[in-house]
Amino acid sequence: EFMGKKTTFAEFMERIDRTAKAYLAMGIGKGDRVTICMPNCPQALDSFYALNRIGAVSNMIHPLSAASEIKFYLDFSKSKAILTLDQFYGKVAGILPELENKDTVLLVARIVDELPPVLAVGFALTKGRKIPPLPKKGNYVLWNEFMRVGRKRDLPLPKELGRFTDCASILYSGGTTGTTKGIMLSNLNFNACGLQTIAASGFAPINGMKMLSVMPVFHGFGLGIGIHTALIGGATCILVPQFNVKTYAELLIKKQPNIIPGVPTLFEALLRAENLENADLSCLKGVFCGGDSLSVELKKKVDAFLKEHNAEVQIRQGYGLTECVTASCLTPKDYNRVGSIGVPFPDTYYKIVKTGTTEEVDANIEGEICISGPSVMMCYMDNPEETEHTLRRHADGRVWMHSGDLGKMDEDGFVYFSQRIKRMIVTSGY
């Protein structure tokens, strides 16, 4: 659901196939990379799944990135095309002549095309007026024209299914050592993350539930849980393109979602939202926090807030890295240990090792957090040295991802995060 416009699963599958045919008509095929430089909106989701449908790879980046950063991501990923919104046209068009691939196609979508008629008129008269008009002749392809060519050519979609080992998407992170890296995530990584998250939720199945999807699609948390977990579980994603506390609070009241994932700053803002004062939040089944540490004090405040508003749930902290899509550890339902980030997801293993080694330490001893399981990344793109440093085979025969985070595990398997080994500054998605 986007701005009140609803799409059924059957309609979404049709949209994916139509978008896949449009990418084929553009010349995109198996293994090709396309950059998606978009907020949470329908064209971004259509493209993410359509590219996967034809065996191509989505390269997910922040639409508010500086022009120089966008150039870096396009060159680094060897993208054949970039999808962005009309409001970012000038920034992206300006770097096209500087790209290594001079044939990179600029595909431009518009939010207004996906709005219900009444909202579309309102948008055109308000926010739309602030968006500079696109040049009549320019080095870009409008989304609607792109889709029209796809319909006209009507190329057959590939019959062979993708493999679980195929790369689905590239996300970016400071990695476990602090420098920007492209993280190659497979079909298995995304599907495992989704199934594990649902299993760990404690309230499966989630079909028919509603998730307020505000975490951005260029982050593992937003894409892996806010979108993919919800969709493979049969839940509705209510897409929120940008966080604004007043709008978000209104959506909570109006849409009555069952699941809300967010970062600590989002929940801090909700505590101050005046329009939630008398809200009934008994609809909530899962309130999940990740992306940064949830302080003991903030957890107490949010739990009290939820109770005051008739919600029978606690805020549950998760932990993970983009190197395993997103979360791989979660506070159990109806249970909490103070300061803990929870227990590992089903089919995922955690161990704590002496920093700089593969030697496991005893319970309650601090060391580096290591993770093994089906959501662990394929590799860092074109960076075998960092991949080798991060993914290591231990004496037990398993490949373990060394997180670069310090923590400990108690006798019952509850994990506690301390800090980054190389402390990095963490900011919100927008």
Predicted regions mapped to residue ranges:
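Conserved ATP-binding/catalytic segment of the ANL
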Residues: 26, 359-364, 368-428
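Hydrophobic alpha-helical segments in the ANL/AMP-binding
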Residues: 20, 24, 42-61, 70-71, ...
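Structural core segment of the AMP-binding/adenylate-forming
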Residues: 25-26, 53-145
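Gly/Ser/Thr-rich phosphate-binding loop
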Residues: 257-262, 271-338, 349
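Short beta-strand->loop structural element characteristic of the AMP-binding/adenylate-forming
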Residues: 35-37, 44, 48, 52-86, ...
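Conserved AMP-binding/adenylation subdomain of ANL enzymes
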Residues: 191-210, 218-261, 273-274
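Conserved AMP-binding/adenylate-forming core of the ANL superfamily
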Residues: 1-41, 45-49, 66-71, 75
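Conserved adenylate-forming
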Residues: 23-28, 150-165, 170-213, 235
